[in-house]
């Protein structure tokens, strides 16, 4: 499930402008050589994170998913949940609703309030927010935390869906990591944009035409 076409297109342009999305030849976590690379860690300033949060908020609103709060898995999800909660508070579609958020620590704190959770109590329908889904480990841990608190995972919200089949080349899964998460936990995965939106840019904008063939070949081999 992706955001509206206009939101997705604007986000792809934004990611390019920020150097977060690049074309070339990159060895990615799976070991594959990818003709593009998306590094959300380069959203690293107040302005860029503020804009990113606006895209997350819009994608969540566009999705129509019913939710009560946000959860950001450590570590990448922490600033994403925080900033997106702020963006939602100012979104006109939220009508002044104040969305709480929480996140976890990697290690339990043994002083003060203690525990591994920080922020609002986990209650109701919870949206897990992260940058991408690679193996689904972060989502699994988040779902366990949310359910252990008596709350309900409502959706996973990510920046980019690579639409890429999981597994080694000689044993490719018929599904992507995103599809596996949706099937395993029975919740939607909402993305701001996807590889399909990147392909639309490559097809529509002549300045990126040189990368079109390589990305299309990669998608044909690994895409879903």
UniProtKB/Swiss-Prot annotation:
Catalytic activity, as annotated: orotidine 5'-phosphate + diphosphate = orotate + 5-phospho-alpha-D-ribose 1-diphosphate
Superkingdom in the source lineage: Bacteria
Binding site for orotate: 37-38, 134, 162
UniProt xrefs under CDD domains: PRTases_typeI
Binding site for 5-phospho-alpha-D-ribose 1-diphosphate: 29, 75-76, 105-106, 109, 111, 130-138
UniProt key word Glycosyltransferase: yes
One Pfam family from the record: Pribosyltran
Gene Ontology terms describing biological process: 'de novo' pyrimidine nucleobase biosynthetic process; 'de novo' UMP biosynthetic process; pyrimidine ribonucleoside biosynthetic process
Pathway assignment: Pyrimidine metabolism; UMP biosynthesis via de novo pathway; UMP from orotate: step 1/2
PROSITE patterns noted in UniProt: PUR_PYR_PR_TRANSFER
Keyword presence, Amino-acid biosynthesis: no
UniProt keyword terms in alphabetical order: Glycosyltransferase, Magnesium, Pyrimidine biosynthesis, Transferase
InterPro entries in the cross-refs: OPRT, Or_phspho_trans_dom, PRibTrfase_dom, PRTase-like
MF-aspect GO terms: magnesium ion binding; orotate phosphoribosyltransferase activity
Function: Catalyzes the transfer of a ribosyl phosphate group from 5-phosphoribose 1-diphosphate to orotate, leading to the formation of orotidine monophosphate (OMP).
Subunit structure comment from the entry: Homodimer.
Family annotation (NCBIfam families): pyrE
Family of the protein in this entry: Belongs to the purine/pyrimidine phosphoribosyltransferase family. PyrE subfamily.
Name of this protein: Orotate phosphoribosyltransferase
Lineage: Bacteria, Pseudomonadati, Pseudomonadota, Betaproteobacteria, Burkholderiales
Gene symbol of the encoding locus: pyrE
